[in-house]
Amino acid sequence: MSEQERETEEDEGVASDTAPMLPRRRPTDYHISVLAPILATRGLGTLVLSGRALVGFLLHLLLPGTVFLLVLLPAAAVVYLGFLCHSRVHPAPGPRCRALLSDRGSAALIVFGLLSLPPLVVLAAAARSLLVRRLRPALPDPARTPAPRRPPRSSGDLADGHPDEDKQLCAWV
């Protein structure tokens, strides 16, 4: 394509076949190697921060899940075995179930498994809190939340040193 044809296409506003599809980069006055360390440290900081957040999320999610699974698995297995061997659930239980358990024994297993779940949930919660307390230095800090604001104290409260008992809130657990 000649120079004259290019000029006429540019004047008309029509794109030519040989025109570049993407805009060209502007020439920079600064050298890119000067900015590379700055960009690398910013990118690395973002990567480390998001990595810590992901590890913290997984620890706070997987730790309770693992503890509760390990503690509650025996009770769930007992309930499953009770349902597996009961004749109303399976019309023809296997020969092992018939040899080991009657329908009354299967019902007893189901009841025992379900009644053992609440104490095991409490035990799992205690084990989780113990693990969190021991792993606190390794776990990332939770997100910062603003401190609750206290209402301004009146001059009467300051003179007594204690707020009125009616205004004071106590919660017993």
Curated annotation (Swiss-Prot):
Domain of life: Eukaryota
Protein name: Transmembrane protein 278
Name of the gene this protein is made from: Tmem278
Organism of provenance: Mus musculus (Mouse)
InterPro entries: TMEM88 (IPR033355)
The keyword Membrane is annotated on this UniProt entry: yes
Cellular component, GO, one term: membrane
Subcellular location(s) of the protein: Membrane
Amino acid composition bias (Acidic residues), ranges on this chain: 1-14
Topology of this chain in the membrane: Multi-pass membrane protein
Family membership noted in the UniProt record: Belongs to the TMEM88 family.
Transmembrane segments: 31-51, 53-73, 107-127
Keywords, comma-separated and alphabetical: Membrane, Transmembrane, Transmembrane helix
Disordered: region residues: 1-25, 141-165
